[in-house]
C-alpha cells in the first residue's frame, strides 16, 4: 500500500489579539490579516508594518533640517481627472526670521507689534500639493506658526526606492527635504518687532546709514550706534523706523511702484506722529543721556523731511535741536564714550543743516544764537565730524556762509544805519578770509578718514564750496561788487565752481556732497549749456549715483532751479538783466532745505 504524500504545512502566523487593523491597512482602508509580529499583507507589498499600537510622532526635533514623508492618495473626480488628498505631518523645526529680500508689500500691517507674526504662503497649482504645519511647543523656541503648501511635481522622480519596494498604485509616498532655518536668537534688538519693523530696521542699518556719511565704514559709522539704543528709547525707535519707511517710499516712488510707495509713506507718517507724541512726553527728562537721545531723534526728523522733499517743519526741528546742543556743549558735560561719536555727528549735521537752510530760506533772524555762532563752539562741533560729514565742506567755509546769510538784506540782525558801509566791509573781510583758506592742507589733515578715501576728490568738493561761498557773499551783499576785487567777479567764480565740480565723476562716492554748490552755480549762470550740465549733475545725484539713493530734497532743488531760470529769463525779456535771484528767493519766504 503506497503511502499518501502529505501536503506541506503552511507557515503558522500568530493572529493579533486585537481586532484593530495595523496602521498601514487602517490608513489604506484595507482588510488586515492581523498577523504577528507584522502584517503579512504589508510584507507582501514590501512595506514596513507600523504595528497595531499608537504611532509615535516626533514633536521636538533639534535638527535644522528634516525630511518629511507625505502620503498623497489619488482620487477620481466626477470629470474623470485625478486629484490628491493632502496629509498633514507635524514637525517642530525652527524657522528663520524674514530675510531682507522679502518684499515690504508682503509684510505685517502693524510695524511695531510685539506678537509673533503669522505667515501664510500659498500657491495655486493643478498638481498635487503637500501641506506642512509647523507647531510651536514652547514659547522659548520663538517659532512662528504658519502653513506652507509645497507643490509636488509629478514629472520629477521621487527619491530612489529599495528593490523590493512595491508601492500601492492607489497611493504614493514622496519624500522631499524641507529646509527650515532657525530664527537667529543672537540679536535681541529684533525681538518684539514685527516683520515689517525688522525690514525697516534692516533698511536703516544698511542703506540709510550709508547715505548719511561720506564713506561708509561699517565699524566706524557713528549713525549705526543709534540702533542698539532703540530698545531703551521708544521715541528713538519710532523715528528710526519712520526714517527708513520714508526712504523706502521715496525709492519705490522713483521706481514707479505706487502701491509700495504709498504703503511705506503711510507707515512713515504714522510712525512720525507716534514719535512726536512720545517726544512731547520725554522732553522734560533732564539726564544727559536723555537730552542726547532727544537731540538724535529731532535731527532724524530733519533727515526725514530731507528724504521726503526738503520742505516741511525742519525749521522748528533745527531750532529745538540747537537749544539742546547749547545745553549739551556749553555746560562742558562729558557724554558716555559709546554715544559721544553719535552725538557729535548728529550735532554737526544739525548745525550744517541750519547753515545751508539759512542761505535760501527767507528770514532767519530767529535763529541767531551768539552762544553757538561765536566762532568757538560752532567750529569745535563741526570739526568733530569732519571725517563723517558727506558735505565735505570745511567748517571755516560753513561759518563764512552763515555770516553772509546774516548779512543778507532783510535777514541780518546787525543792519547798519550808515548806508550799509559796515556790511560792505564785513562782506569784503569774509571774501578775503575765504580766498586765503588752504583747502588742500585742511583735507590732508582730517583725522579718521579711511585709507582708501579719494583725497583729491575731497579737495575738489571743498574748493567748489569755497568758490560757491564767495559767490554767495557777493549775492548776499551786492554792494561788495563795487570794490572790484580781482578774480571775484561772479562770472569768474561761476567758471571756477564748474571747473572744480567737473573733476568729480558722476559715479563717485563724494558726488552727494556737491548738491549745494551745484545749485548755487546753476542758479547764477545764464548759459544754457551750463544750466543743462548743472541739471544733469543733480539728476546724477538723484538717480545714477550708486552710492546714494533718491532723497527728495535733490528733486526739490531741480524744481527750484527751473523756476529760477524761468524768472530770470522772463526778467531778461523785459529788459532787466541784473536780477538777483538770491534776493528774489529770500523774499518769497521759501522754506526749502538744500544741503
Swiss-Prot record:
Gene Ontology terms: cellular component: nucleus
Sorted UniProt keywords: DNA-binding, Metal-binding, Nucleus, Transcription, Transcription regulation, Zinc
PROSITE patterns: ZN2_CY6_FUNGAL_1, ZN2_CY6_FUNGAL_2
Region (Disordered): 69-172
Single GO MF descriptor: DNA-binding transcription factor activity, RNA polymerase II-specific
Any single Pfam family the record assigns to this protein: Fungal_trans_2
Compositionally skewed regions (Low complexity) per UniProt: 69-88, 118-138
Coiled coil: none
DNA-binding region (UniProt annotation): 22-49
UniProt xrefs under CDD domains: GAL4
Subcellular location per the Swiss-Prot or TrEMBL entry: Nucleus
UniProt cross-references to SUPFAM superfamilies, sorted A to Z: Zn2/Cys6 DNA-binding domain
Biased composition (Polar residues): 89-117
Keyword Zinc-finger carried by entry: no
BP term (GO), one: positive regulation of transcription by RNA polymerase II
Function: Probable transcriptional regulator.
Protein name per its UniProtKB record: Acriflavine sensitivity control protein acr-2
Species for this entry: Neurospora crassa (strain ATCC 24698 / 74-OR23-1A / CBS 708.71 / DSM 1257 / FGSC 987)
Upper lineage: Eukaryota, Fungi, Dikarya, Ascomycota, Pezizomycotina
Amino acid at each position: 500500500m503506497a503511502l499518501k504524500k502529505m501536503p506541506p504545512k503552511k507557515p503558522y502566523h500568530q493572529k493579533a489579539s486585537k481586532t484593530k487593523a495595523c496602521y498601514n491597512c487602517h490608513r489604506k482602508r484595507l482588510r488586515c490579516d492581523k498577523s504577528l509580529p507584522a502584517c503579512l499583507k504589508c510584507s507582501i507589498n514590501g512595506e514596513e508594518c507600523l504595528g497595531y499600537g499608537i504611532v509615535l510622532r516626533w514633536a521636538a526635533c533639534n535638527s535644522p533640517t528634516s525630511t518629511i514623508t507625505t502620503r498623497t492618495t489619488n482620487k477620481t473626480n466626477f470629470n474623470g481627472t485625478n486629484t490628491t488628498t493632502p496629509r498633514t505631518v507635524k514637525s517642530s523645526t525652527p524657522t528663520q526670521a524674514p530675510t531682507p529680500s522679502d518684499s515690504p508689500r508682503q509684510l505685517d500691517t502693524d510695524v511695531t507689534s510685539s506678537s509673533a507674526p503669522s505667515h501664510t504662503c500659498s500657491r495655486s497649482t493643478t498638481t498635487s500639493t503637500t501641506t506642512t504645519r509647523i507647531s510651536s511647543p514652547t514659547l522659548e523656541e520663538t517659532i512662528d506658526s504658519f502653513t506652507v503648501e509645497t507643490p509636488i511635481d509629478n514629472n520629477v522622480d521621487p527619491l530612489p526606492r529599495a528593490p523590493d519596494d512595491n508601492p500601492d498604485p492607489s497611493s504614493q509616498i514622496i519624500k522631499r527635504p524641507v529646509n527650515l532655518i532657525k530664527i537667529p536668537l543672537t540679536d535681541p534688538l529684533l525681538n518684539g518687532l514685527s516683520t515689517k519693523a525688522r525690514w525697516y530696521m534692516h533698511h536703516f542699518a544698511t542703506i540709510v546709514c550709508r547715505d548719511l556719511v561720506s564713506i561708509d565704514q561699517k565699524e566706524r559709522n557713528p549713525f549705526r550706534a543709534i540702533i542698539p539704543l532703540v530698545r531703551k528709547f521708544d521715541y528713538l525707535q519710532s523715528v528710526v523706523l519712520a526714517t527708513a519707511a520714508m526712504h523706502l517710499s521715496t525709492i519705490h516712488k522713483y521706481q514707479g511702484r505706487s502701491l509700495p510707495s504709498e504703503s511705506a509713506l503711510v507707515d512713515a507718517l504714522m510712525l512720525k506722529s507716534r514719535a512726536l507724541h512720545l517726544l512731547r512726553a520725554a522732553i522734560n527728562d533732564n539726564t544727559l543721556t536723555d537730552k542726547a537721545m532727544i537731540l538724535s531723534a529731532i535731527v532724524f526728523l530733519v533727515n526725514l523731511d530731507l528724504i521726503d522733499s526738503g520742505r516741511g517743519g525742519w525749521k522748528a526741528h533745527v531750532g529745538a535741536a540747537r537749544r539742546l546742543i547749547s545745553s549739551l556743549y556749553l555746560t562742558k558735560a562729558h557724554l558716555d564714550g559709546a554715544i559721544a561719536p553719535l552725538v557729535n555727528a548728529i550735532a554737526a549735521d544739525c548745525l550744517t543743516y541750519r547753515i545751508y537752510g539759512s542761505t535760501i530760506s527767507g528770514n532767519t533772524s530767529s535763529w541767531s544764537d551768539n552762544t553757538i555762532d561765536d566762532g568757538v563752539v560752532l567750529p569745535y562741533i563741526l570739526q568733530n565730524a569732519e571725517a563723517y560729514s558727506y558735505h565735505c565742506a570745511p567748517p571755516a567755509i560753513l561759518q563764512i556762509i552763515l555770516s553772509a546769510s546774516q548779512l543778507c538784506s532783510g535777514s541780518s540782525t546787525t543792519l547798519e544805519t550808515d548806508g550799509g558801509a559796515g556790511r560792505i566791509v564785513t562782506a569784503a573781510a569774509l571774501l578775503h578770509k575765504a580766498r586765503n583758506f588752504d583747502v588742500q592742507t585742511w583735507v590732508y589733515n582730517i583725522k579718521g578718514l579711511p585709507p582708501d578715501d579719494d583725497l583729491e576728490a575731497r579737495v575738489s568738493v571743498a574748493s567748489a564750496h569755497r568758490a560757491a561761498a564767495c559767490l554767495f557773499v557777493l549775492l548776499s551783499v551786492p554792494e561788495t561788487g563795487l570794490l572790484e576785487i580781482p578774480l571775484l567777479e561772479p562770472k569768474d567764480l561761476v567758471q571756477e565752481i564748474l571747473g572744480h565740480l567737473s573733476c568729480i565723476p558722476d559715479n563717485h562716492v563724494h558726488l552727494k556732497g556737491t548738491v549745494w554748490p551745484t545749485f548755487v552755480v546753476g542758479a547764477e549762470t545764464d548759459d544754457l549749456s551750463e544750466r543743462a550740465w548743472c541739471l544733469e549733475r543733480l539728476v546724477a545725484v538723484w538717480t545714477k549715483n550708486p552710492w546714494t539713493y533718491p532723497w527728495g530734497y535733490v528733486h526739490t532743488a531741480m524744481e527750484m532751479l527751473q523756476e529760477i531760470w524761468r524768472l530770470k529769463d522772463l526778467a531778461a525779456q523785459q529788459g532787466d538783466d541784473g536780477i538777483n535771484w538770491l534776493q528774489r528767493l529770500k523774499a518769497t519766504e521759501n522754506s526749502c532745505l538744500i544741503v
